[in-house]
């Protein structure tokens, strides 16, 4: 898969900007707060219809404007493909594939695949469970576009159920409606749990292998999906039964706390190094190694499932890695994956590597092509 060009209009700090990608590797260099991450965010948005930096479309639109557009031309297995999105909070999103408007997000997702690795991902180990759930969900959205509908249906059931819990204790309690939302929560929640659990099972051996390489065979990484619902033998029937039972058991406490306490919206992912919780014991260096192993696993999994090489988006991460890990990452990338990476300095990139890359200078929402020497001089 190759992203040939990108056009941004009123997206973040870009007023109107076209970029043509001319090499498998593109380095976006510039000072802080110039728009480097914003450009990667636009590509991430085309891949997942989400940003890991914000949940609100409004934030993506340039201040003082009503709408933003992202347009991309790519080549997928030799076939050209045009993608376009228009974000307008007042009237919603418009998604187009090859000039035709698509109604379902599932028809847009999966057209462009990308694996993003940013310094925010370093939070995957120590951050909140929501960060790890979002990570799984973003991968699933690319592997299985219909997952977006499943998430939406689940979130709707959760919102309705929480609204009912807020009314609990008042007159006119509607038990039938409560049971109906419980059923929706259990059916869709079970589907989500099973998909996430299967994803972990597929990522685990890949991440384990990478981790072994990165840690010089010193540590063994294990991944587990930590659900509030006992998974039993992992079948739908077993999870549905356990989920229903957990809801019945926790009914009193949910009524007291007025919120839903059981379901995939509360689940987590566990990482262990040599059987010890990475969240509690991993050093900064071990966390970086672990996250790099996860990202390399993600890259391999997306590639094997979609049958094409995803784009790799590296947002300011090379500086976070030591020379050995940088070397491994750059070697894996080779020319196999089209890679867009941001940096404030070109120094960490070896000279031969820089010479092969397209270097773009980002300054206050404008992008200019520069030679290696020119970028170095102004660096
Ligand atoms: N909706 C918006 N409208 C206008 N400007 C915005 C909007 N959202 C973000 N910005 C601006 O974009 C800039 C941040 O860009 P970005 O996050 O891409 O930085 P960066 O170049 O990657 O820098 P760093 O190296 O610090 O990560 C800031 O100046 C911010 O004010």
Curated annotation (Swiss-Prot):
Keyword DNA-binding: yes
One BP term from GO: double-strand break repair
Coiled-coil ranges per UniProt: none
Cross-referenced CDD domains: ABC_RecF (cd03242)
GO molecular function annotation: ATP binding; single-stranded DNA binding
Primary location recorded for the protein, binned into one broad class: cytoplasm
Binding site for ATP: 30-37
Entry keyword set: ATP-binding, Cytoplasm, DNA damage, DNA repair, DNA replication, DNA-binding, Nucleotide-binding, SOS response
Pfam families in the record: SMC_N
SUPFAM superfamilies: P-loop containing nucleoside triphosphate hydrolases
Cellular-component GO terms for this entry: cytoplasm
Location within or outside the cell: Cytoplasm
Function in brief: The RecF protein is involved in DNA metabolism; it is required for DNA replication and normal SOS inducibility. RecF binds preferentially to single-stranded, linear DNA. It also seems to bind ATP.
Family label: Belongs to the RecF family.
Entry-linked HAMAP family: RecF (MF_00365)
Full protein name: DNA replication and repair protein RecF
Gene (name only): recF
């Amino acid at each position: 898969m190759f992203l040939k060009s990108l056009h941004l209009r009123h997206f973040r700090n870009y007023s109107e900007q076209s970029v043509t990608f001319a090499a498998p590797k593109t380095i976006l260099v510039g000072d802080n707060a110039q728009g480097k991450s914003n450009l990667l965010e636009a590509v991430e948005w085309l891949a997942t219809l989400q940003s890991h930096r914000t949940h609100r479309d409004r934030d993506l639109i340039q201040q003082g404007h009503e709408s933003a557009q992202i347009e991309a031309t790519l080549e997928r297995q030799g076939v050209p493909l045009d993608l376009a999105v228009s974000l307008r909070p007042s009237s919603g999103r418009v998604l187009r594939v090859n000039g035709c408007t698509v109604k379902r997000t599932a028809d847009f997702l999966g057209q462009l695949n990308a694996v993003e690795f940013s310094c925010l991902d370093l939070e995957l180990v120590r951050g909140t469970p929501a960060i790890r759930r979002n990570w799984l969900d973003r991968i699933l959205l690319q592997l299985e576009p219909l997952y977006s509908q499943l998430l939406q249906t689940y979130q709707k059931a959760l919102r309705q159920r929480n609204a009912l819990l807020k009314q609990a204790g008042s007159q006119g309690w509607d038990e039938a409606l409560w049971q109906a939302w419980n059923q929706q929560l259990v059916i869709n929640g079970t589907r989500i749990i099973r998909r996430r659990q299967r994803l972990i099972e597929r990522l685990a051996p890949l991440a384990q292998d990478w981790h072994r390489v990165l840690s010089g065979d010193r540590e063994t990484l294990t991944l587990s999906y930590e659900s509030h619902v006992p998974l039993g033998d992992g079948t739908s029937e077993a999870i549905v039964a356990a989920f229903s039972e957990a809801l019945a058991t926790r009914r009193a406490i949910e009524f007291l706390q007025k919120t839903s306490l059981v379901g995939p919206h509360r689940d987590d992912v566990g990482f262990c190094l040599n059987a010890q919780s990475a969240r509690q014991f991993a050093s900064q260096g071990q966390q970086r190694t672990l996250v790099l192993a996860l990202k390399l696993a993600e890259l391999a999994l997306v590639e094997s499932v979609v049958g094409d090489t995803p784009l790799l988006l590296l947002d300011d991460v090379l500086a976070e890695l030591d020379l050995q890990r940088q070397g491994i990452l750059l070697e894996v990338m080779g020319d196999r994956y089209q890679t867009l990476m941001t940096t404030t300095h070109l120094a960490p990139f070896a000279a031969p590597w820089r010479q092969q890359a397209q270097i773009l200078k980002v300054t206050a929402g404008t992008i200019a092509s520069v030679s290696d020497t020119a970028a170095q001089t102004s660096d």
